[in-house]
Amino acid sequence: MKLKLTAALLGAVVLVSAGGCNFMELSLEDALRPPKTMGDEAEIEQLISNSAKGGYTLKYPKNGNYRSAIIMRDLDGDKADEAIAFFHGKDETAKIHMLVMNESDGKWQIAGDYVTETTDVDCVDFSNITESPELEILAGYTTYTPNVNFLSCYTYSNGTTSTIQAGQSYSAFYCGSLDNSGKDGVMTLNLFTADNEAKATLLEYDKEKRMLFAKASVSMDPNVVKFRHVVFGELENNVKGIVVDGAYASDELVTQAIYFNNDLAVLRNPLYRERYKNPTLRTVGVYSEDVDNDRIVDIPTVEKLPSAGVDSAVKITDKVTRNTFSPAGETLNRKNDYAINFDYGFLVKIPATWQSGTYTAAVENTSMKFFAWQDKKLGSELFEIRSFDAAAWDQGKDNDGYTVIYRDNRYAYAFRNETVADSPFYLTDNEIKTAFSVLNPS
């Protein structure tokens, strides 16, 4: 019985990766992880102090998975962390230092000090973009223009750090592979501004020129004002892509699936077509994610269940459909349908045997009831899922005829099955239990 569901499906929380930089998710504790020992910390802070010469202020990245001003990461694979610190000196309010430090023979030393004219660090990430054994440092810095940042890249090896030419502007960037080569690329996403068009750009490393170059770019929806959630992953048939959930000014959500077409050597973004409605446009806060662990990114679409003529006091819920995206046909392919009770944190997977347009579901206080939809009106009740206060359930209050599916510290979730054996909607009790999921079980 499946009794939990990722927050990506329900959209009940904003994921860590929504801020940009990287599709991997870390806990806040990991993101703010300090140097490994007090001795190391003291040495690192002394190096920062010596470099600042007169006092300093640590600068914390605003977005991404690495939010600490002092980030510990093994850059060269020797199982010993290097340290990357961001700060500005006492009289350097418009300049930020990125100090790279390594430990050699038990003593911490400076491996690179890079000064950038900016006031804030947007985000930091690490990725293998040069195919060398070392991880590169990707640092994004803010500008005075909202939603416009600029990218810098550095590589560390044998105790020294050097610059990889970058300098691209972006609103958010993400690292990952769009093919099976094992080599990472950098995908920059740009929101529309007065100076920049909305687009996605795939950056790759040019070994001879020691620089990141734009391999391909594609237009994005200019009406998106914020990227809510972004994930690298497989679409279908071993084709990898980046799936971007963005928000309009109206708070409506829309998804764009971007992939590199090897035959044409171009980036494609087929779900966005100028002057055409994106089929993923929705008001329900559900996001793209691999929700069933099949390594395929699932893209949500939302539509209202049948409700014409139903009393306005009856709240008909939405049907959330999980789809895969096929690069071959550039189409969405339906996988599963769900009905969700957001107020009480549970949902029901719609049986595959139920035909679209023949059923509907209503949310009423703590319950969700399913009905047949016949002759354009509510038909017979099929089954109900109800959330009971856990203490009231234990006392047997108003729960006659209900069978518990799941209980936590707050609620007991129970069902009442009204389907009959000769009906096309017939479900066994076990099928109802299996179709049920809760959000964030305690």
Feature names for model-found ranges:
Residues 371-378, 416-421:
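Secondary-structure transition/turn motif
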Residues 374-392:
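A short acidic-to-branched-hydrophobic micro-motif
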Residues 19-363, 371-373, 392-395, 401-413, ...:
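Beta-propeller-forming repeat regions
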Residues 2-26:
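Sec-dependent N-terminal signal peptides of Gram-positive bacterial secreted proteins and lipoproteins
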Residues 4-6, 412, 418:
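Small/flexible residues
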Residues 419-442:
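C-terminal partner/receptor-binding element of secreted or periplasmic proteins
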